[in-house]
Amino acid sequence: NVIKKHKPELDMERVYLNAHTHGIEPHRHIDDGDYTIIYYPRLDWKTEWGGGTFVNDKFVEYKGNRLIIFTASMPHQAQAVSRQCYELRTCVVFKTNVKKD
């Protein structure tokens, strides 16, 4: 399990697939829980399509097979997808909490 490998002290609460296309304007938000983990599965994603993520005002480029982990209370926002992209921007999101003894 990818979470146990990178953050063994976490329990997974929810997991879901997030997806959007050009024309969808994501909003800046924070998550509940302790940590958010985002996995970018699209190996065919092109840099010029955009679709990365801003975490606490730092940009993380969408690269296939990339995993990012950050404190859930950090403001974050998906980057809009370019008009040149006719594909679906997808990411798998894991909402986690620190294990309680």
Question: What are these model-predicted stretches?
Answer:
Residues 1-67, 73-101:
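Fe(II)/2-oxoglutarate oxygenase catalytic core
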